[in-house]
Swiss-Prot record:
Notes concerning its domains: Three calcium ions are usually bound at the interface of each cadherin domain and rigidify the connections, imparting a strong curvature to the full-length ectodomain.
Tissue note: Kidney specific.
Species: Homo sapiens (Human)
Residues modified by glycosylation: N517, N602, N722
Protein name: Cadherin-16
The keyword Cytoplasm is assigned to this record: no
Top-level taxon in the UniProt lineage: Eukaryota
Range of residues in the leader sequence: 1-18
Keyword Transmembrane: yes
Matches recorded under PANTHER family: CADHERIN-16 ISOFORM X3 (PTHR24027:SF424), CADHERIN-23 (PTHR24027)
Topological domain spans for side Cytoplasmic: 808-829
Cadherin domain span: 25-126, 131-235, 242-336, 341-449, 455-564, 569-665
Its membrane topology: Single-pass type I membrane protein
Record keywords: Calcium, Cell adhesion, Cell membrane, Glycoprotein, Membrane, Metal-binding, Phosphoprotein, Repeat, Signal, Transmembrane, Transmembrane helix
Length: 829
């Protein structure tokens, strides 16, 4: 038993699947069929098992049709019931189905296309019975000036609707019966070549043409119709126009009318072409317009071609040419040329040398004032108080030349030149042109030394070759590095090649070096003259005095360093030795040939001192703090007095001894002597006790020091001469004149003596002799007696003068009338 679900699936699947669409059937029925009806057209492939169904014939919309078609249910034929008119309907779209009473489709739909076959049952018709046309003289032959229109309702594309046009007659037939030609297929009426030549001689008249249209193409049979064409011959108005001048930047309402053309013939269409393309247009009446402002600088002239054409775009005649000239106005600024790279001008170029030539472009009309450009130099301006300028500009040519003011190398000058149109007149435009000028350097400066005299330079004769003697520096005022390259040479003063030069190629510094050994005996001095010159060729005046420099070299004699008689020295001293105690004498190994100056180094305690020239070493102070058995080391340095740089040194070791028992200080009187104050250049010799047999206990040497009294040490100075004598002088410039007793301590080994030196300090005369104060001499007047004598003498003189004047007065009273010169003088007693 089959399941219910499987049976339902089998039933529903065929209904769900789409049915195949039957192919369309095409049936042709002749138009205006004259036979019996109904006319069986075709048998449809109906199914056999569909006898129970109903055949339904419908139109292309699916609705049942009541037209001239029907279905024979018995035979299954499609039939037409009456004649069909193709011009009424050319095709019928039908579909046939087999349906149940409830509308269920058992078969179909079957599409059927019924085409009505055309037959020549229509007569062609002209669109007009009478055509009127105007023909202008000058129309080209073969160019249609009238198109005849005719129609045929038969099926298009068949011979039934294939029309042909013909001219049947022309009236009048003069001057030629074939004045016109008619294109058979298009119906285009044109002037024939013969008519074109005859038309010029023909009078202005109207021609009537009888034209025919026939269907069936070129077959002899067919339907036909006729019409009349009236052609009026008129004079040509297609004449050239004068050039049109339009101002650029014209401020009017656009489009702006500028001209008009006219083709006197009929059916004309105007076409405008602009060369180059421009803002122009033409309307149907032949009016020419400009549609916007013109720019002469963009396009100065246009060539317009206006064509008169028929409806098919064919020219009736040659196109008219119209020249449109754009008139210039001053609406453009002079444009300076692009700024070139910097223009280089050598310094010292003569006046009039052309620097550059400016050529400003003005886009206005060439040759007109609008484009007439002149030039004016704006910068640099003339300097105050200076005549002339460094640059000049020719106003017409724009040539920039050098002026009378000189230029300096290294200058970078920006020239500002004003370019003006309208020849500089008021109201014109202007631009500022820039020209950068660089003044290049030339080799017009000779190098010179900054110092012409160097030295004297001292060199020891043992200096090594290669030693730098001097560094010379030369400068060159030129700016170009190639012009600053220098060559150096020794011009004179070095015949033996003792010296040499070395320098860097791009440097102005040259080193004078020693090449050979110096010899003081051969040449104690040298004067080396060094010359400098430019490597590049010099322009202008040659080198001056500064191109040479003189180096003076002094050769120093080399002295061997001094040498002491010992490599080291030692001395012993009791720790109780007083200041000034003699220790030892430092001597050179060759004391005759050179003089040395001695000094102590590293005397940190300050216990010792050394005589500069004698080399005697003494204690400078008491040896406080020294212990017996200790040593004290200092360095003795000896310098050559003539060559301080030459020196020698040796260590001095002092051994401290135990102090011996202090002996009694013995006073030894010394005879008095005198010294002058203010101090003069002499002193007193103090002898040691060795000359006094009572004080001497042995032979020298002795050491001499002043006593410990601070006043004595301030006022007096004691200098040891040798081992037995000392020299006493004043330490101050002024010491009170009187007798002074100076204690001098003399020591020898462990013994000490004190000498009392009596010194009379006095004023001295010019001969250095002492002037002493003396007492009152016997019989010498006193001061009081001297004053009394002086007063008595003065009183006696006064009394005597009074007596003389009294006597003279009395003598004048005795003889008053006698002249004074007649009175004899009286002798006076």
């Amino acid at each position: 038993m089959v399941p219910a679900w499987l049976w339902l699936l089998c039933v529903s699947v065929p209904q769900a699947l789409p049915k195949a669409q039957p192919a369309e059937l095409s049936v042709e029925v002749p138009e205006n069929y004259g036979g019996n009806f109904p006319l069986y057209l075709t048998k449809l492939p109906l199914p056999r098992e569909g006898a129970e169904g109903q055949i339904v014939l419908s139109g292309d919309s699916g609705k049942a049709t009541e037209g001239p078609f029907a279905m024979d249910p018995d035979s299954g034929f499609l039939l037409v019931t009456r004649a069909l008119d193709r011009e009424e309907q050319a095709e019928y779209q039908l579909q046939v189905t087999l349906e149940m009473q409830d509308g269920h489709v058992l078969w179909g739909p079957q599409p059927v296309l019924v085409h009505v076959k055309d037959e020549n049952d229509q007569v062609p018709h002209f669109s007009q019975a009478i055509y009127r046309a105007r023909l202008s003289r000058g129309t080209r032959p073969g160019i249609p000036f009238l198109f005849l229109e005719a129609s045929d309702r038969d099926e298009p594309g068949t011979a039934n609707s294939d029309l042909r046009f013909h001219i049947l007659s022309q009236a009048p037939a003069q001057p030629s019966p074939d004045m016109f030609q008619l294109e058979p297929r298009l119906g285009a009426l044109a002037l024939s070549p013969k008519g074109s030549t005859s038309l010029d001689h023909a009078l202005e008249r109207t021609y009537q043409l009888l034209v025919q249209v026939k269907d069936m193409g070129d077959q002899a049979s067919g339907h036909q119709a006729t019409a009349t064409v009236e052609v009026s011959i008129i004079e040509s108005t297609w004449v050239s126009l004068e050039p049109i001048h339009l101002a650029e930047n014209l401020k009017v309402l656009y489009p702006h009318h500028m001209a008009q053309v006219h083709w006197s013939g009929g059916d004309v269409h105007y076409h405008l072409e602009s060369h180059p393309p421009g803002p122009f247009e033409v309307n149907a009446e032949g009016n020419l317009y400009v549609t916007r402002e013109l720019d002469r600088e963009a396009q100065a002239e246009y060539l317009l071609q206006v064509r008169a054409q028929n409806s098919h775009g064919e020219d009736y005649a040659a196109p008219l040419e119209l020249h449109v000239l754009v008139m210039d106005e001053n609406d453009n600024v002079p444009i300076c040329p692009p700024r070139d790279p910097t223009v280089s001008i050598p310094e010292l170029s003569p006046p009039g040398t052309e620097v550059t030539r400016l050529s400003a472009e003005d886009a206005d009309a060439p040759g007109s004032p609008n484009s007439h450009v002149v030039y004016q130099l704006l910068s640099p301006e003339p300097e105050d108080g200076v005549e002339g300028r460094a640059f000049q500009v020719d106003p017409t040519s724009g040539s920039v030349t050098l002026g009378v003011l000189p230029l300096r190398a290294g200058q970078n000058i920006l020239l500002l030149v004003l370019a003006m149109d309208l020849a500089g007149a008021e109201g014109g435009f202007s631009s500022t042109c820039e020209v950068e000028v660089a003044v290049t350097d030339i080799n017009d400066h000779a190098p010179e030394f900054i110092t012409s005299q160097i030295g004297p330079i001292s060199l020891p004769e043992d200096v090594e070759p290669g030693t730098l003697v001097a560094m010379l520096t030369a400068i060159d005022a030129d700016l170009e590095p190639a012009f600053r390259l220098m060559d150096f040479a020794i011009e004179r003063g070095d015949t033996e090649g003792t010296f040499g030069l070395d320098w860097e190629p791009d440097s102005g510094h040259v080193r004078l070096r020693l090449c050979k050994n110096l010899s003081y005996e051969a040449a104690p001095s040298h004067e080396v003259v060094v010359v400098v010159q430019s490597v590049a060729k010099l322009v202008g005046p040659g080198p001056g005095p500064g191109a040479t420099a003189t180096v003076t070299v002094l050769v120093e004699r080399v002295m061997p360093p001094p040498k002491l008689d010992q490599e080291s020295y030692e001395a012993s001293v009791p720790i109780s030795a007083p200041a000034g105690s003699f220790l030892l004498t430092i001597q050179p190994s060759d004391p005759i040939s050179r003089t040395l100056r001695f000094s102590l180094v590293n005397d940190s305690e300050g216990w010792l001192c050394i005589e500069k020239f004698s080399g005697e070493v003494h204690t400078a102070q008491s040896l406080q703090g020294a212990q017996p058995g200790d040593t004290y080391t200092v360095l003795v340095e000896a310098q050559d007095t003539d060559e301080p740089r030459l020196s020698a040194s040796a260590p001095l070791v002092i051994h401290f001894l135990k102090a011996p028992p202090a002996p009694a200080l013995t006073l030894a009187p010394v005879p008095s002597q005198y010294l002058c104050t203010p101090r003069q250049d002499h002193g007193l010799i103090v002898s040691g006790p060795s000359k006094d047999p009572d004080l001497a206990s042995g032979h020298g040497p002795y050491s001499f020091t002043l006593g410990p009294n601070p006043t004595v040490q301030r006022d007096w100075r004691l200098q040891t001469l040798n081992g037995s004598h000392a020299y006493l002088t004043l330490a101050l410039h002024w010491v009170e004149p009187r007798e002074h007793i100076i204690p001098v301590v003399v020591s020898h080994n462990a013994q000490m003596w004190q000498l009392l030196v009596r010194v009379i300090v006095c004023r001295c005369n010019v001969e250095g002799q002492c002037m002493r104060k003396v007492g009152r001499m016997k019989g010498m007047p006193t001061k009081l007696s001297a004053v009394g004598i002086l007063v008595g003498t003065l009183v006696a003189i006064g009394i005597f003068l009074i007596l003389i004047f009294t006597h003279w007065t009395m003598s004048r009273k005795k003889d008053p009338d006698q002249p004074a010169d007649s009175v004899p003088l009286k002798a006076t007693v």
